[in-house]
Structures are given as structure tokens and as C-alpha cells.
Amino acid sequence: MIESENPNTLDEPVIQTILRDLKMIGFKLYHVILPRGNAANVLRDWDLWGPLILCLVMAIFLSISAEEQKALEFTIVFVVVWCGAAIVTVNGQLLCGNISFFQSVCILGYCIFPLTIATIIIWIIQNFTMIVKLPIVGGAWFWSSFASYGFLGSSVPESRRLLAVYPVLLFYLVIAWLVVVQ
């Protein structure tokens, strides 16, 4: 059998597949940390592993910090993130967006990374007052919103851009509020 330059991924070892996926997750997180206007490479290869991991980490930390009904807190965070991303994506599609459903959900999911970091920071130092929590989470909300605008802002016609961005801001605001009230 002749080895090709691009082997079939079904033939590669599991560890190689996991490392390749982790590398792609890191690449996408890098673009969220340092948002740039050119997001074509990030949007081309969408995945849902990174958003799932970020959502699970956020939901776990918020449910751990809940005093009562930890399972309910986990469920609320998980449902708000995924249903909210789906609703915002459908809104973008209805406004003649030019990216696919899963590309948009992928980007919205990766852009919760700053809010996930804020959740972990607030969980580590649990005695934060609201005065300290608000700037941390507010900065994470702005960062998430700014990063997602860099990806999704150009996918909608300019005349409808505000109609597409406003629900994204609300989506991240709801998630930020869940982090603040933990």
C-alpha cells in the first residue's frame, strides 16, 4: 500500500487526532484572545469541541459555586449558552448572513472564552464583592463581544449589521450576568 501525503484521518492514531484537534482549538482561542479582521481561516474549519469544552468548564465552575441546586445551575448555563447561540445564529441567517449555522455557533461558542476565564477568576477568589466582580466580568463581556464582532460583523450586510450585533451583545450580557450573580 502506498502512503499518501494526506492520509485518511480514519487511519491515523487516536492520539494524533486528539493533538490535531487540540491544536485547532488553541488556534481558534488565539484568534479570540487577539481578534483580527481576517477570520477566513478560523471560519473555514469550524468545530464544536472547543465551545463544548468552554461551556462545560463555565457550567461546572458556576454550579460548584452555587449554594443550592447545583444541577439546576449547570443546566441553566448549558442551555443558555447553546440555545442562545442557536437563536443568535438564526437571527444572523435571517438577516442574510453569509456563514453557515455551525460556523456561527462555533464562533459564538469560542468567544465565551473571556467569560469562562472571568468565571474561573471569580471562583478562585470567592470573596469578591460586586464592586470587584463587575469590572472583571464587564471587561470579559466587552472582550467577548468585540471578538465575536470581528468574526460575525462582516458576515452580514452593512445595512443590517446593528440588527445582527445587538442580539450578540445581549447573548453575552446574559452569560455575564450569570457569572456576576454566582
From Swiss-Prot:
Q: Which InterPro entries match?
A: Yip1/4-like (IPR045231), Yip1_dom (IPR006977)
Keywords for this entry?
A: Golgi apparatus, Membrane, Transmembrane, Transmembrane helix
Q: What is the lineage of its organism?
A: Eukaryota, Amoebozoa, Evosea, Eumycetozoa, Dictyostelia
Question: An example of a Gene Ontology BP annotation on this entry?
Answer: endoplasmic reticulum to Golgi vesicle-mediated transport
Q: Which GO terms describe its cellular component?
A: Golgi medial cisterna; Golgi membrane; Golgi trans cisterna; trans-Golgi network
Question: Which ranges of this chain reside in the Lumenal compartment per its record?
Answer: 67-70, 126-133
- State the similarity comment: Belongs to the YIP1 family.
Q: Where in the cell is it found?
A: Golgi apparatus membrane
- Membrane spanning residue stretches: 46-66, 71-91, 105-125, 134-154, 162-182
Domain of life of the organism encoding this protein:
Eukaryota
Membrane topology per the record?
A: Multi-pass membrane protein
Which residue ranges does the entry give as Cytoplasmic-facing topology? 1-45, 92-104, 155-161
What is the protein named? Protein YIPF6 homolog
Query: What is the originating organism of this protein?
Result: Dictyostelium discoideum
